[in-house]
Amino acid sequence: MIQRDRLVNDFEAMSQFTAPGEGINRLAFTDADWAGRQYIIDRMVDAGLTVETDGFGNVIGYKVGKNPDLPVVMVGSHTDSVPNGGNYDGVVGVLSAIEVIRSMNDDGFEHDHTIAVVSFMCEESGRFGDSTLGSKAMRGALTVQDLHRLRDKQGTSLYEVLKGRNLHPDEIEQVEYKRPVKSFTEIHIEQGKVLEHDQKRIGIVTGIAAPERFYVTIRGNADHSGATPMNL
């Protein structure tokens, strides 16, 4: 059975891993984010998971099933935040997955498929202006060139940041997850107001907006917008 007190304690602990400011400030690969990542690793180990990390820093904890040759059932989310973020966005998906594992251990529940609890790194765009980078790395959709191109407001490249955390940016294309995956499930906060408005406790997502980001260069002259004809 799910133990509410364990989850409450975990959320409270994670809320302490933040830089100063309002809300949660746990931008990807900062000291606060790295400390939160270690907390997640520790909780996975406590739950009996076999923990692995990849060259991008993604964390995967395995609970081996009765038939380890079957495709894995993957659950999880991320724990980095946007500036002035909340304590549940992403975090609820990781901590709830760990709590499910703890509850299965308590109940002696056996399962056929191996379960993989995943905490993706750098899923928010708050630091490098691009999102879902950890999951892109696991899909083989991130290149060394991308790591050099993506920079934070201080001009530090993602490549340099990964090096600073003793990760392996030059091997980023080897991070691609090779094991067959049966399914991926993520518990997430509602980022809109539909469930709240309809007084529903939970919803199943069947579609989601997919943002696109473009780099645009506009060339021209600065002139008065009301008095300058376009042909001049």
Regions found by a protein language model. Give the residues of each.
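N-terminal capping segment at the start of a domain
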Residues: 1-30
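Short coil-to-beta-strand
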Residues: 7-10, 68-76, 210-217
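Thiamine diphosphate
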Residues: 28-48, 71
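Alpha-helical metal-binding/catalytic segments enriched in His/Glu/Asp
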Residues: 75, 84-123, 212-218, 224, ...
